[in-house]
């Protein structure tokens, strides 16, 4: 859980209360508009947990693959140990799609054949909803493996993903679409179960169980924490509001809100005007989301990568050890 901030603080003042993970929480999902600092917050969270001896996987769902740049290390399609207790992973969607298609070839052959549609494996990755299904499957495997204490999800920008909940004007990211995808897939699976043999039925049931497992993980605040990152500007604030409302309408609780790139000291008139505008948006967010943990991060004034992540981790979570419950 992120530290709570009740007022805008000068950059030099540290917030003392450390992060609190309650019970067996395993998944920290970081969401928000593109360009607000999700990847930096994801990476800094991984730094903080791994520094406390917790095996952590930072898992990028962003096609831009910013984690490589932020950690200043080349990452690939397999988890890579980048420092003690911290692994990072940037899966290649095309490669994962080929593997996923091979894994469930019988299901997809039956499904596409039912509608007399021929789909080549190389075209599979571009189909709506496939990337979410692949990530769901991959996350399920990670949870079953139980190798890591925490999995940090650096999500794709909400405006870059195709919603599966009939919400064309609101893109809500992986969490919401997994929940909606479940209902669509159950209808298709029920249809397939009437016309195919035991081997396909078993594969269908396996996929259904995985969808149910990840749904239960996302709905349980003891196993998942959703953090929304935003900046104090109109477009970002409005998209964050829609994201939170849509996700929570499906039973997934957003526990924390990070307000990034906040100007805290300025001399020029332009900066003072911008700071006044930011203050207005910050106060609105604090008023609207009083029940959530709200953290304010300063504008660091330079690119955050490598060793600078330690400062962000401290600003997010403090210097202390993890609280116990």
Model regions: which residues?
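Signal for well-folded cores of large energy- and translation-related assemblies
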Residues: 144, 166, 179, 212-215, ...
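Nucleotide-state-sensitive switch-loop elements of NTP-binding domains
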Residues: 16-36, 40-165, 169-205
